[in-house]
Amino acid sequence: MLKLTDITWLYHHLPMRFSLTVERGEQVAILGPSGAGKSTLLNLIAGFLTPASGALTIDGVDHTTTPPSRRPVSMLFQENNLFSHLTVAQNIGLGLNPGLKLNAVQQEKMHAIARQMGIDNLMARLPGELSGGQRQRVALARCLVREQPILLLDEPFSALDPALRQEMLTLVSTSCQQQKMTLLMVSHSVEDAARIATRSVVVADGRIAWQGMTNELLSGKASASALLGITG
C-alpha cells in the first residue's frame, strides 16, 4: 500500500498538499488541468522532490526522506531518458546493474522482459535507430526489469499516435497485472485513463480535488468532470 498523509511541497511559497491511499496492485490515473500539480505529486512519490512536511509510507515503511535510488519505485517520463551511446540491451541492463555487469540470472531476466515488450530483436541497436514507440518500449522494459512494486508514468506516451498509445497502455496494464505492480499514471486524457484505470484522482490547485471511478468522470456526472471539460 502507498499512503501519503498531508505531504506538502512549497511552490513559490504556495503549499501543494496531498493525502492519498493506493492499494497494492491498484491502477490509478492522475488527471487535472495543466499546472495543477500532477507531476509534482509523482515527483514527491518518487523522491525527486523532498516534502516540507507530511509522511509517505510504502507497505508500512516510512519513505518520506528516502532518496530516489533507494525507493521501491520506478518512474517513466515522456522523455524516455535512454542513453544514445548505449545499445538497447545496455539501456535495459542499467535497470539491473548501473555498472552493466550482469550475471546469468540477470541476463535472462533482461531478455525475458525484452521478449515481453516485443523488442528482443532490437537488443543490439542504438536508440537513434528506433522509432518513438520502440524507444518507449525500451524505457518501459528498463523500469519493469527493476521489479519495484510501484510504477509511476508521467505522460510517457502522449507524443505517440492514438493507435500506438492505446497499444502501449494495454502493454503497461497487462505487465503491471502480471508483476502485481501498483500503477499511478498522469494523463491529460480521461479516455486514456479509462483504458487502464478504474479509479482516477483529479488534482487542481495543488490539492486532490476529487477521487472516484473513472467512468463517473467520463459520464460528466462527477463534481470534478467540469475541471476536465466534460459535461453530462
From Swiss-Prot:
- NCBIfam families assigned to the protein according to its UniProt record, in alphabetical order: PRK10771.1, thiQ
What is the native source organism of this protein?
Escherichia coli O157:H7
What family name appears in the similarity comment?
Belongs to the ABC transporter superfamily. Thiamine importer (TC 3.A.1.19.1) family.
Family matches, as SUPFAM superfamilies: P-loop containing nucleoside triphosphate hydrolases (SSF52540)
Please give the Gene Ontology molecular function terms for this protein.
ABC-type thiamine transporter activity; ATP binding; ATP hydrolysis activity
Protein name per the record: Thiamine import ATP-binding protein ThiQ
Tell me which UniProt keywords the record has, alphabetically. ATP-binding, Cell inner membrane, Cell membrane, Membrane, Nucleotide-binding, Translocase, Transport
Extract the Pfam families matched here.
Answer: ABC_tran
